[in-house]
Every structure is written in C-alpha cells, then in structure tokens.
Amino acid sequence: MGGLSIWHWLIVLLIVALVFGTKKLRNIGNDLGSAVKGFKDGMKEGETPADAQQLPRTGTVDVNAKETTRSDSNKA
C-alpha cells in the first residue's frame, strides 16, 4: 500500500486522456519535445573548446615601460 502499482498509473493515465483528449496531449508532448531539443541545442552552442576561448596574444610587451602619473603628464 506504500506505493502506486502499475494499475493505479494506468487508471490515472486513462482519466487524464479522457479529460484532456488525446489530441491535446499529443500537442503538449510535441511542444515539450521541441522545448527540450531547443534547450539541448542551446547548451551545445554554449560549449566551445578551451583553445577557442582564449584569444591569441600577438602584442609585444615593453619590459622597461614606466608608469606615468597624472603629475608627470601635467609637466609636459
């Protein structure tokens, strides 16, 4: 008595089919399926390889560069 048997689920399914109709249930199933497919496609678009996410560094770095302050720029 703790859980529902297969017969309980079949009766519930039959009542739901009678209340909503099979056409309405089929439309709901199609909508749900397309929503899940769209979600999966969106998740695949979000995934990119780690190498593609990093931008290539082609610039040079001036090791001897000195930081200019606001007072240094006013002197010029």
UniProtKB/Swiss-Prot annotation:
Q: Where are the transmembrane segments?
A: 1-21
Q: Entry's Gene3D superfamilies?
A: 1.20.5.3310
InterPro entries, per the entry: TatA/B/E, TatA/E
- Positions of region (Disordered): 40-76
Q: Give any single GO term for biological process.
A: protein transport by the Tat complex
Q: Which UniProt keywords apply?
A: Cell inner membrane, Cell membrane, Membrane, Protein transport, Translocation, Transmembrane, Transmembrane helix, Transport
Q: Where is the composition biased (Basic and acidic residues)?
A: 64-76
Output the Gene Ontology cellular-component terms.
Answer: TAT protein transport complex
Source species, domain of life: Bacteria
Q: Where in the cell is it found?
A: Cell inner membrane
Briefly state the protein's biological role.
Part of the twin-arginine translocation (Tat) system that transports large folded proteins containing a characteristic twin-arginine motif in their signal peptide across membranes. TatA could form the protein-conducting channel of the Tat system.
HAMAP family the UniProt entry points to? TatA_E (MF_00236)
Please state which protein family the record places this protein in. Answer: Belongs to the TatA/E family.
State the protein's name.
Sec-independent protein translocase protein TatA
